[in-house]
Swiss-Prot record:
Recorded name of the encoding gene: E1
Disulfide bond annotation, renumbered to this chain: C145-C222
Compartments (UniProt record): Host membrane
GO CC annotation: host cell membrane; membrane
Keyword Membrane among record annotations: yes
UniProt cross-references to Pfam families, sorted A to Z: 7tm_1
Organism annotation: Equine herpesvirus 2 (strain 86/87) (EHV-2)
Protein name: G-protein coupled receptor E1
Listed GO biological process terms: calcium-mediated signaling; cell chemotaxis; immune response; positive regulation of cytosolic calcium ion concentration; positive regulation of monocyte chemotaxis
Length: 383
């Protein structure tokens, strides 16, 4: 009887332990399921800064150290390449436009301002390289953070406005060739460029104020910092403004302009007019190819709580997509000089003349064998 009682006690204890374990597993499963239905939230150490610093709705933490680590290891090297090639290319564009093409019409003025916009953006890249490489530890002070963020957005908006104005300029030149001559003068060009930069600066004013703050550990983070009571409202309004100005507005204007231009060229084919719009058309297409993916992913990242119900793993994938598309978008600032060299016939001719006149002479002076007329030069050998 004693043995039976002991066995019964052991079985009861084992059954209780099993039931407790199963109940704990079930409770854990339920909590996990409920948590997965709630939108995830970003860690304060996330990579995304400035344009793409997305703060998800209040929920259980969703840490994404893999994205942060990848950004710190890869992005600074890519930004360095973009900085070097972009700086060289856009400086060449500025020199050639001023030295050879002359600032005598609206088109050349806008091309010059487009290069200056790219240069302004490029000059901020070394700071972002350092910031990302240091895992978001800003060491240059809050004032410089605000200034550089504002300059970033101002260069983006001025670039968009310049491309829009180049499209409108081509539209006027093709559709209203004679009438447009009154508006495509140097004076109108100067007024247009001044208004462009003023409007870009005005639209960038919030970025000069709502960036840079010090966390509880004393670290300065150069990220968007909005009033606590309405952080999500400010952030969504900011992203909506960026997407409207950098994607929707230029897309609508350029679609209408090129629709009318193509209809006119189909009715009255003109090789000269075709050449006149080819360069600007390629510049426009390149802009959308590089910036559209980023804008779409940014939209999903910001409004995903309303549009989608993402689990942490899917949210991490979205952040990785944001990292990739942002890097591609930043690469655009070194693309325009390449387009000019391959598509712009006049630019290519002036570029060749510049290298032949200034670069080749110095290379031959300091590297004699490049000139092909050294002392040991021999005549052709006859067989």
């Amino acid at each position: 009887m004693a043995t039976t009682s002991a066995t019964s006690t052991v079985n009861t204890s084992s059954l209780a332990t099993t039931m407790t374990t199963n109940f704990t597993s079930l409770l854990t499963s339920v909590v996990t399921t409920i948590a997965s239905l709630v939108p995830s939230t970003n860690s304060s150490e996330d990579y995304y800064d400035d344009l793409d610093d997305v703060d998800y709705e209040e929920s259980a933490p969703c840490y994404k150290s893999d994205t942060t680590r990848l950004a710190a290891q890869v992005v600074p090297a890519l930004y360095l390449l973009v900085f070097l090639f972009g700086l060289l290319g856009n400086i060449l564009v500025v020199i050639i436009v001023i030295r050879y093409m002359k600032i005598k019409n609206l088109t050349n003025m806008l091309l010059l301002n487009l290069a200056i916009s790219d240069l302004l953006f490029l000059l901020t890249l070394p700071f972002w390289m350092h910031y990302i490489g240091m895992y978001h530890d800003w060491t240059f002070g809050i004032s410089l953070c605000k200034l550089l963020r504002g300059v970033c957005y101002m260069s983006l908006y001025s670039q968009v406005f310049c491309i829009i104005l180049l499209t409108v300029d081509r539209y006027l030149a093709v559709v209203y060739a004679v009438t447009a001559l009154r508006f495509r003068t140097v004076t109108c060009g100067i007024v247009t460029c001044v208004c462009t930069w003023f409007l870009a600066g005005l639209l960038s004013l919030p970025e000069f104020f709502f960036h840079g703050h010090q966390d509880d550990n004393g670290r300065v983070q150069c990220d968007p910092y909005y009033p606590e009571m309405s952080t999500n409202v400010w952030r969504r309004a900011h992203v909506a403004k960026v997407i409207m100005l950098s994607l929707i507005l230029p897309l609508l204007i350029m679609a209408v302009c090129y629709y009318v231009i193509i209809r006119r060229l189909l009715r009255r084919p003109s090789k000269k007019k075709y050449k006149a719009i080819r360069l600007i058309f390629v510049i426009m297409v390149a802009y959308f190819v590089f910036w559209t993916p980023y804008n779409i992913v940014l939209l999903l990242s910001t409004f995903h709580a309303t549009l989608l119900n993402l689990q942490c793993a899917l949210s991490s994938n979205l952040d990785m997509a944001l990292l990739i598309t942002k890097t591609v978008a930043y690469t655009h600032c070194c693309i325009n000089p390449v387009i000019y060299a391959f598509v712009g016939e006049k630019f290519r001719r002036h570029l060749y003349h510049f290298f032949h006149t200034y670069v080749a002479i110095y290379l031959c002076k300091y590297i004699p064998f490049l000139s092909g007329d050294g002392e040991g030069k021999e005549g052709p050998t006859r067989i």
